[in-house]
């Protein structure tokens, strides 16, 4: 029997975990030495590469000194917390990767806490020691303190630390003596991480993730915790509420390098993919057909936020996208539910709308961005935070927020957070930067990032994670400025935009097509302002030729999808099409808005 090590990678966004796995893959000669290291092998989804975040957990396996090492790459963002917990169930130890300059960040803490609670043994890798002014030794102390505060056992606190630079491709026990490759890390994995326990008996495999193939449908992935599985074997699927179904395994695959290899039998402790089992959910157990024993189901974080998805019914609908009907959107959301655990979907008030529940703005905006790239057109409402009633009291989700800013911007950062009902817990100087910790309601985080970056000239680093439900903190003032709303459908003309520059700032370029009811800018005052920017200049003979000035407009404010979701008000929607993002009023007609009581002023 081949020896196995199952290991999960934990790291903060952008601390280099995907690069490290790529290095391990080269070390095991699975890929010939690359011409361009920039292409991350694991983040194989466009959005992941663009944003530099891992969303879905991936599995890769390398063989070193005859031992098979299964590496499971976990997402670092607590918005994808549903992914993290399942993945840790497959691992026997964890590789904690920290940046030698930044140290431990809240996201790392989130995953590490889950891993320590499950009793996994850690190895700490201090990465990026090639960075100028890094502080590897201090970071190692920080990790120790963090583990103490997370109630780690003495055995877990006696962890091994390896220093190195994944980018340059070396690891070493001492950061002052670089080596030529990453073998010290692989040796440490073999020495420190326990092999999975071999348990004789009837098979038990808990489905911890799933893959989808257009040919064979849904594939169950999990770690075989007891017994062995064979191709063609009859098994039971133990679902929630003691439901048991009989199935036959059509095909078994284990992870081999970057792909999968078909096998006839899977030994205990290995991670495998099972084909031929229909209708399984994450957390179900594949067990013996005669006397099935189920493993306890996996708990997944509850959603903290909801958003309304509806069909695109703006005047420009169907111009960009391939999929525009409510049936297309429903089918796509149902498909997403199969693989995205922390997501829930309920029907909306009318047939064309759906309420989608998720873990945060990032979680939901990644879904919207994926749909947009696939050719969908849809409209999305303002994100709403979910309240709970606990002991008769209205409670709301509170997040643990940490902000790192240069010293001169500390005042601005504290003011922004406290204005949104944030409570400053402690601040600690780190060189010329300061780390601030707050407890803040989830609704206070909406739009905070963009304001914070503006206030700190782009220098702030912000991270947050869900902490607990606490009593409602009271109203938070949202954006104070009204919108500039178009009165006409047509083309935006530079001449009329120039005349309205003193009224606010624009979100669109001259020459863009706009429609009546579209939000084209931000008003300088509180109320909305209805404006006509489709007026052209009358070219009659009356005016003197010399008195014309060239129109110079300041560049428009361009927002990303997340910024738009955080910016819109209750009576506005974001229209998402493959090539455009627009903001609009729910009621396009100014007279309808007047009747409903939030009409705005007319220009």
Where are these predicted regions, by residue range?
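P-loop NTPase switch module centered on the Walker A-proximal segment
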Residues: 1-98, 102, 142, 210-213
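Conserved nucleotide-binding/hydrolysis micro-motifs of P-loop NTPases
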Residues: 15, 31, 77-78, 101-104, ...
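Active-site phosphate-binding and catalytic loops of NTP-dependent enzymes
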Residues: 30-57, 80, 146-158, 190-203, ...
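Canonical P-loop GTPase G-domain recognition
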Residues: 121, 131-191
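A glycine-rich phosphate-binding loop feature that marks nucleotide/adenosyl-phosphate handling sites
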Residues: 159-167, 202-211, 347-358, 384-390, ...
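Conserved nucleotide-binding/hydrolysis modules and their immediate coupling elements
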Residues: 204-307, 317-319, 481, 490-540, ...
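Long insertion/accessory domains within large nucleic-acid-processing enzymes
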Residues: 255, 260-263, 395, 440, ...
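Charged, conformationally dynamic linker/hinge segments
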Residues: 292, 300-432, 443-445
């Amino acid at each position: 029997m081949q020896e196995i090590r199952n290991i999960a990678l934990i790291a903060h966004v952008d601390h280099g975990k995907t690069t490290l796995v790529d290095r391990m893959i080269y070390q095991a000669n699975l890929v010939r030495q690359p011409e361009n290291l920039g292409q991350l092998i694991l983040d194989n989804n466009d959005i992941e590469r663009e944003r530099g975040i891992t969303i879905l957990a991936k599995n890769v396996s390398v063989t070193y000194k005859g031992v098979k090492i299964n590496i499971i790459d976990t997402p670092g963002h607590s918005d994808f917390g549903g992914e993290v917990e399942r993945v840790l169930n497959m691992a026997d130890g964890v590789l904690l990767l920290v940046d030698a300059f930044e140290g431990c960040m809240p996201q790392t803490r989130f995953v590490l806490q889950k891993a320590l609670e499950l009793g996994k043994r850690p190895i700490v890798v201090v990465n990026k020691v090639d960075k100028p002014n890094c502080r590897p030794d201090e970071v190692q102390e920080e990790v120790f303190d963090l583990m103490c505060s997370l109630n780690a056992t003495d055995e877990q606190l006696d962890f091994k630390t390896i220093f190195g630079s994944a980018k340059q491709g070396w690891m070493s026990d001492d950061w002052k003596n670089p080596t030529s490759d990453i073998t010290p890390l692989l040796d440490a994995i073999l020495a420190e991480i326990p092999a999975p326990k071999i348990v004789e008996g009837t098979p038990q495999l808990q489905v911890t993730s799933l893959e989808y193939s257009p040919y064979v449908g849904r594939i169950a992935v999990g770690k075989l915790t007891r017994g062995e599985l064979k191709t063609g074997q009859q098994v039971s699927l133990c679902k929630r509420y003691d439901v048991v179904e009989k199935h036959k395994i059509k095909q078994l695959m284990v992870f081999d390098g970057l792909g999968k290899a078909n096998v006839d039998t899977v030994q205990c402790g290995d991670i495998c993919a099972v084909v031929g089992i229909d209708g399984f959910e994450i957390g179900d157990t594949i067990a013996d057909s005669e006397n099935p024993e189920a493993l306890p189901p996996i708990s997944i974080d509850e959603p903290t936020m909801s958003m309304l998805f509806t069909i695109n019914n703006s005047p420009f609908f169907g111009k960009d996208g391939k999929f525009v009907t409510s049936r297309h959107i429903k089918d796509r959301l149902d498909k997403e539910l199969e693989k995205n655990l922390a997501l829930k979907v309920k029907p909306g008030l009318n047939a064309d709308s759906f309420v989608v529940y998720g873990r945060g703005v990032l979680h939901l905006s990644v879904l919207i961005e994926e749909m947009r790239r696939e050719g969908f057109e849809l409209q999305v409402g303002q994100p709403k935070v979910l309240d709970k009633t606990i002991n008769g009291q209205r409670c709301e989700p509170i997040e643990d927020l940490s902000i790192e800013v240069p010293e001169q911007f500390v005042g601005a950062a504290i003011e922004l957070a406290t204005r949104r009902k944030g409570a400053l817990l402690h601040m600690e100087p780190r060189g010329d930067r300061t780390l601030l910790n707050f407890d803040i309601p989830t609704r206070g985080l909406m739009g905070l990032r963009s304001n914070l970056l503006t206030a700190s000239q782009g220098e702030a680093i912000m991270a947050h994670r869900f902490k607990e439900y606490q009593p409602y903190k009271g109203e938070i003032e949202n954006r104070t400025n009204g919108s500039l709303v178009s009165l006409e459908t047509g083309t935006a003309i530079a001449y009329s935009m120039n005349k309205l520059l003193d009224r606010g700032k624009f979100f669109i370029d001259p020459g863009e097509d706009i429609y009546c009811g579209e939000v084209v800018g931000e008003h300088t005052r509180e109320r909305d302002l209805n404006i006509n920017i489709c007026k052209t200049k009358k070219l009659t003979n009356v005016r003197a030729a010399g008195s014309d000035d060239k129109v110079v407009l300041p560049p428009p404010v361009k927002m990303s999808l997340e910024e738009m979701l955080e910016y819109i008000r209750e009576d506005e929607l974001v229209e998402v099409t493959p090539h455009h993002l627009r903001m609009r009023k729910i009621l396009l007609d100014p007279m309808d808005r007047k009747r409903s009581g939030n009409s705005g002023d007319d220009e």
